[in-house]
């Protein structure tokens, strides 16, 4: 579904679309919470860039095991608790307490290899993490043999 560059103010409730492969709605006027996408089990790409989103529902991205790209740049998001999501996450230019950060979380299914970031950073279950940004405030240990660097 491609809805970019319109004046949409909402995106409905997409959880009942299990065959949805991509959802692109950047450059609109979408407000409020990102809805629950957990029922979109084939979703691989989501772009809600440059909207007016402030939060997302708990579990909005759970069960999205095929997801590999989310772009949430240029919104008004204030939360980062994406513990179970292993994707390319572009969340900079928001109001997240940890700072404007572009984060790549790559899905690695062979072995655990989890990074030991504190849960308050929202990335405690990430297997691969690449963070780009200034003063992003992450702390914790990296396992001695990471799966990928």
Segments predicted by a language model, with ranges:
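Canonical leucine-rich repeat
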Residues: 11-12, 32-34, 56-59, 80, ...
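Beta-strand-rich solenoid/repeat architectures in extracellular/passenger domains
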Residues: 16-17, 28-29, 39, 76-79
